[in-house]
Structure formats: C-alpha cells, structure tokens
C-alpha cells in the first residue's frame, strides 16, 4: 500500500516539477530573445549610430535617420485605424443588434476567413485590384500610401469586428430595454448608452488594431517601393508617394547586395524600436482594460479619451451636426403665457425637429448597412479575385501546382506541410504542459500575471522581429544551415515559427483549460482523486474540443506567416529536400515573385494564393463547424453509430 502511495506521489510531483521547469525555461528563452536582438544591434557602427536621430535616410551614405520611416508608419496606421474603426464598430452593431444569432454566426465565419488570409494575398490584391481603383476611378497614383491605408484598414477590420462583437455580447441587454421603455428607440439606446458603456473597451480594441497595423511588413512591400523620403516630402506629394514604412525597410534591406554587418545592425535597431512601440501599445491596452486601474490612475483615462476622440473625430462631428440641426431649428423653445400666440409655430418646428431626429436614426442604420456591405463585400471581392484568377492560373500550361520540382507550387505546399507537422510536434506538448502548470498548479497571482503579460505582449509582436531572432540565433550562432552562417534552411524556419506558435498555443490551451468548470475539479478532489488524475481524466478530456480548435488555429497561423520564413528559410527551394537546405513555403513563394523577372510571376502568385486560401477555408470550416458538431454528439449517439457500423461489417461478411 505504501509503495502504491509513494508511486502515486512520485508521478504527481513529476508532472508538477516537469511542467514548472518548462514554464521557466520558456521565460529564459524569451530573455535570450531580447539579448540576441540587442547583441546584433550593437554592431551598428559609430557613423550609423550618430545618424539614427537625424532626418537623412540613405544607408549607402551611412545615413539611417529613423524619423521619416517612423512618420510614414504612424500616418499610414492612423489612417487605416480611422477607416477600420468606423466600418468595424458599425458592422459589429449591425451583427449584434440587427441580426439573428444564426445569421450572426455565419457572418462571423466570413470575418474569420478574412482574418486568416495571409498578408501577402492582401498585398497582391492591393497591387492588382485596388491600384486599378485608385488609377482609373480616383485618378491617383496606383501604388501609393493611400492604397496602403485602404489595404491595412481591411486587414485590421476583422480585429475590430471580432473584439467589438465579443464586447457587445457581454453588455447587459436590459440597458436597451430601460431606454426603450422611456420612449427612446433602439437605435438611440445603442448610440447613446451602449456605445458609451463600451468606450473603455473600444479604446483597448483600437490600440490593439493600431499595433497590428504599424507592425505589418510583407503586404506593404507589394505597394511601397521608395526610400527617398527627403525628396518626396520636399516635393509636397506625401500621400501619393510610395515611401516605405519602418517595417518594410527592414524586410527590404535585410538581404540586400550592399548589406553588411553595420547595415544589419541598423535594421535590428529598427526592429527593436518597433518591438518597443508595440510592447508599449499592448501594455497600455492590457493595463487600461481593467476599470480599477483607470480609477487609480486618472492619466490613463485621459489618454484613453484622447485616443477615442482622435479616431472618432470625424464620425462624432457628423453626429454632432445632426444634433445641432435638431436643437437649433426651433425658434420657440417652450410655450408660455407671454408667447401663447406662437403655439402654431412651436408645433410646426417641433414636428420638423422630430423629422430630423428620425432622419438621424435612419442614417445611423443606413451607415451600419453600408459598413457591413463594405466589410463583407471586401471579403467577397478578395475571394472572387483569388478563386477566379487562381483557377485560370492553375489551368494554364505553366502551372506547377502538381509539380514537385524545386521552383514549384507543389514543392512549396510540401515544405509547408512538413513545417506544420514538425512545428506542431515540437510546440503542442510544450504549450500544453506550460498551460497545465499555469492553470492547474501555480497558485501565485503575481507569477500568473507576469506570464500572461509576457505571453500577451509577445504574441502580438511583429513576426519579422521573430525572423530577426531566428536569423541571429539559429543561423548566425548555431549555423543550422548547410550554407553556414550566411545560409538559410527549413530547420531554422521551423524553430523560428515554433517560437511564434508556442506563445499562441500556450494562450489558447490556457483558455481551453479555463473553460472547464471548476466544480468538476472540486468534486473530484472531494472524492480523493489526485490532481494528476483530475488533470488527465477530467480536465483534459473536457477541454479536448478547445485544444483541437487551438491546434487547427495554430496551423492556420503557420500557413499565414511570411516574414519569419522569408528571413530564415529563404525565398526559393533547394533542388534536394533536406531540413538543412532552403525551402520556400506557400506564402514566401507568393512574396518571392515580387523579385522574379519571369513573365508568369503573377500567375504563380495567383495559383499559390488559391492553394493557400482553400487550405485556410478548410481549416476554418473544421474549427468552426465540424469539430463543434462532432462534440455535440453525445455518447449515446456515438454508440448508435458504432452499432450500425458493426452491423454493416457483419452484413458485409455474410
């Protein structure tokens, strides 16, 4: 008996110690992440270091002024945020308050598809379709900052819609009922009460969306080509220019022919600056999300209000215009004894005022419809663009979808599948064990908050920063490439994307474990069941659905990534297949055609885009419909299916 108890305790301690060790090794990994970035940044050289805070940018002349690239990044991101917030919030109001739950669920699936589309496909769409709109309809330069603002706005719209919709679902619906019972209509309740109620959350959503926009790299390179900042600004053609953002400067010069150690040091510093900016934005978002924090630190509330007022300046002023029209049109404000003769004018103007108010509410609903049409119309447009043109490209004689040579879409698909398989094999067990320790064993709120902050902050980092880490550590230090320190390899790409996916999987596994009712654990402990047995026999089986969905979403994330693979795995595949040799993925194959001189480069982009989008839609279908449907089948139904299957086998034998 004592031996059994000792064995049981040994197993219990083994899981706890092992998962805790992994969790703290995870922290060490990300400390080394920052150390390696800083180490590479110190190689900048004195000439470049002196020029960092100047206005001149010309890496060939050792001028690396950061202000103009940073200014372009900020202006483009703010422009995209203004458009995305206006369309996204109104679309969310339409989905939550105008649509039935079944319709909302189906429309939300379309938004999930938009959020899963790789950024390089957005870039391809902007360079091929949006450019025509700007050139032929607006009579503006086709490839410009205005094009990028439009593209980025639709890239961050899914973030705004999904987060705002989730926020609205938690708002008490009694607020609307109370306002309606006082004589106001539903639209008035939404915009006067609900919108104010979610104002702090909206600020957090806008901050996260801005961080996503400012960190975009690969899609921007499809449109922006110039680094002549001083010349463009002196000629007063900023918005119609094709000046590069800070992130796209990194991806442009990281493998340039004239690149040396000092230029790479400059690019690492640019990456660290983006890292700091995004970290501060995420820190503000996480910190200000807590109402108690806003009460304790009033300056946070002022910053939050400032962000809200800047982004909503135009919509709020349009609404204020209608309020002014409805309030100032009445010359007779109130009927009294001394103006009884003016009662007919009073009622006439009052009626006109009511008409203006109704028109205002009608316009709000109309705006919701237009915004919803724009959001879902863009999804339809990009899907039609990919499916129609991709199908034509696949049916051409030059299609390489079913070829597995070095420069083929089939080989890129195989490389992507290999990367997915190895990455998931590495990261999923590690992420699950770390999530188990954080959720089931750790009792310290401070430790849990530190881990959650690190995970949330690093999860939203620009993926090109991870690419720089992979370049400096896996290729330059460990030399995990057949070409040595200056080469690229599939294994370097796999390990780099594993770092990215590990963060995502830890968080999603944590959420899946949290969704399991704590009453089940308490009941099991009351029966004398050990914590290890509770985890493996109760918690994990109950969280299985969430864990499978997390796994599928992580595969989706791997397929959609470009920057980490572009820097570590290369833009082309080797003639031989080996993990130590270069290998392009589906997304890097699309991006690599930007630098190709082949006449069929666009066709290659289109056929690869079609393969990627079909793959992603299947994954989203599995995670949103198939997996939940399978788990809705109760045990009895599974037994019925099993008995029918056995009867069929018996019948087949006879």
UniProtKB/Swiss-Prot annotation:
The keyword Phosphoprotein does not apply. It is found in: Cell membrane. The keyword Disulfide bond does not apply. Residues 70-285, 413-623 form the ABC transmembrane type-1 domain. It is a multi-pass membrane protein. CDD domains: TM_PBP2. One of its GO terms (biological process) is phosphate ion transmembrane transport. It holds the Pfam family BPD_transp_1. It comes from the Bacteria. PROSITE patterns: ABC_TM1 (PS50928). The chain crosses the membrane at residues 22-42, 64-84, 113-133, 143-163, 266-286, 303-323, 368-388, 417-437, 453-473, 486-506, 535-555, 613-633. GO terms for molecular function: phosphate transmembrane transporter activity. Keywords: Cell membrane, Membrane, Phosphate transport, Repeat, Transmembrane, Transmembrane helix, Transport. InterPro entries: MetI-like, MetI-like_sf, Phosphate_PstA, Phosphate_Transport_Permease. GO terms for cellular component: plasma membrane. Belongs to the binding-protein-dependent transport system permease family. CysTW subfamily. Could be part of a binding-protein-dependent transport system for phosphate; probably responsible for the translocation of the substrate across the membrane. NCBIfam families: 3a0107s02c. PANTHER family: PHOSPHATE TRANSPORT SYSTEM PERMEASE PROTEIN PST, PHOSPHATE TRANSPORT SYSTEM PERMEASE PROTEIN PSTC. This is Phosphate transport system permease protein PstA homolog. It comes from Mycoplasma genitalium (strain ATCC 33530 / DSM 19775 / NCTC 10195 / G37). The lineage of its organism: Bacteria, Bacillati, Mycoplasmatota, Mycoplasmoidales, Mycoplasmoidaceae. The gene is pstA.
